[in-house]
Amino acid sequence: MTTAFTVVIPSRYASTRLPGKPLQLIGDKPMIQLVWEQACKSSAERVVVATDDPRIIEACQGFGAEAVLTREDHNSGTDRLAEVATKLGLAPDAIVVNVQGDEPLIPPSVIDQVAANLAAHGEARMATLAEPIEDIATLFNPNVVKVVSDINGLALTFSRSTLPWARDAFAKQPDVLPEGVPYRRHIGIYAYRAGFLHDFVSWGPCWLENTESLEQLRALWHGVRIHVGDALEAPPAGVDTPEDLERVRRLLGA
């Protein structure tokens, strides 16, 4: 049976590394439109863009997306989702999928998968996905978030650092990917129950979240179990920098 869920796409205009990121053109479309189109191809009952900027609202109206204007002072995309869940009147047990607004190549199957994974793992209050890291440059890239899970597929931690650090292997060959270590790249997509979002906001950011700039660490800090599935179809990395934007444009022939 198909899992019922709502997709919310948090989208901020301000970006330190790429100002105006959601409205950057890829071909003849703003990036936020490509993300929304991919989300609409999933099994979601509803797809909503959540933004703090009227310019993004106007752009969304131009291509037919439902968009909600939120406060500007949210600490993370998940905090923004909590406001939207309240405005939409979502039931506490409703599944909400957070699709990052800078993932224009995200496969619809991945969106469906993370929603289904949350529904299937009652011990987890959040679900997300990962894929193997297969080259040393990706492993050492701080824009690539690494994740380590336990034997039950629950997250132990996330970091922008090389995680885990293969002490002996790197001492011998510091520029070679160690064999036998299942390094994984975290894919920035989350599923949660709407009721959990309100708990998340009430906790406020923790120092670890602020240090790494990774909102999921707030959940781990408070003992929340996060299920990490192996993505059936992994997207290319999202858009964080001007170089990333050019990479996506090349991939799409734009």
UniProtKB/Swiss-Prot annotation:
Its EC number is 2.7.7.38. Its main location: cytoplasm. It is found in: Cytoplasm. It catalyses: 3-deoxy-alpha-D-manno-oct-2-ulosonate + CTP = CMP-3-deoxy-beta-D-manno-octulosonate + diphosphate. GO terms for molecular function: 3-deoxy-manno-octulosonate cytidylyltransferase activity. Pathway: Nucleotide-sugar biosynthesis; CMP-3-deoxy-D-manno-octulosonate biosynthesis; CMP-3-deoxy-D-manno-octulosonate from 3-deoxy-D-manno-octulosonate and CTP: step 1/1; Bacterial outer membrane biogenesis; lipopolysaccharide biosynthesis. Gene3D superfamilies: Spore Coat Polysaccharide Biosynthesis Protein SpsA, Chain A. InterPro entries: Cytidylyl_trans, KdsB, Nucleotide-diphossugar_trans. GO terms for biological process: CMP-keto-3-deoxy-D-manno-octulosonic acid biosynthetic process; lipopolysaccharide biosynthetic process. It comes from the Bacteria. Activates KDO (a required 8-carbon sugar) for incorporation into bacterial lipopolysaccharide in Gram-negative bacteria. This is 3-deoxy-manno-octulosonate cytidylyltransferase. It comes from Pseudomonas fluorescens (strain SBW25). The lineage of its organism: Bacteria, Pseudomonadati, Pseudomonadota, Gammaproteobacteria, Pseudomonadales. The gene is kdsB.
